[in-house]
Amino acid sequence: MAKLKTRRGAAKRFKATANGFKRKQAFKRHILTKKSAKRIRQLRGCVMVHVSDMNSVRRMCPYI
C-alpha cells in the first residue's frame, strides 16, 4: 500500500498533543482596530481542535 501524504498546510497549522490537536485562534491577523482590547486578548494563545473536526485533522496529518 502506498504511503499517505500529509497536507502540508494543515501540518503547519496543527500540533499534536496527548489529548488531540491544538490550533491558533482565528480573527487575529488584521482589521483589529474595530475589535475591543478584551476580544483581542481572548484570541491570544492556542485552543484545542473540536471533537467533530478531529477525524478531518487526523486524515490530513496522518504522521503528526
Curated annotation (Swiss-Prot):
Keywords noted in UniProt: Ribonucleoprotein, Ribosomal protein
Protein species of origin: Acinetobacter baylyi (strain ATCC 33305 / BD413 / ADP1)
Single Gene Ontology MF annotation: structural constituent of ribosome
Keyword Phosphoprotein: no
Domain of life: Bacteria
Protein name as catalogued: Large ribosomal subunit protein bL35
GO cellular component: cytosolic large ribosomal subunit
GO biological process: translation
Matches recorded under HAMAP family: Ribosomal_bL35 (MF_00514)
Family according to the record: Belongs to the bacterial ribosomal protein bL35 family.
InterPro entries tied to this protein: Ribosomal_bL35, Ribosomal_bL35-like, Ribosomal_bL35_CS, Ribosomal_bL35_sf
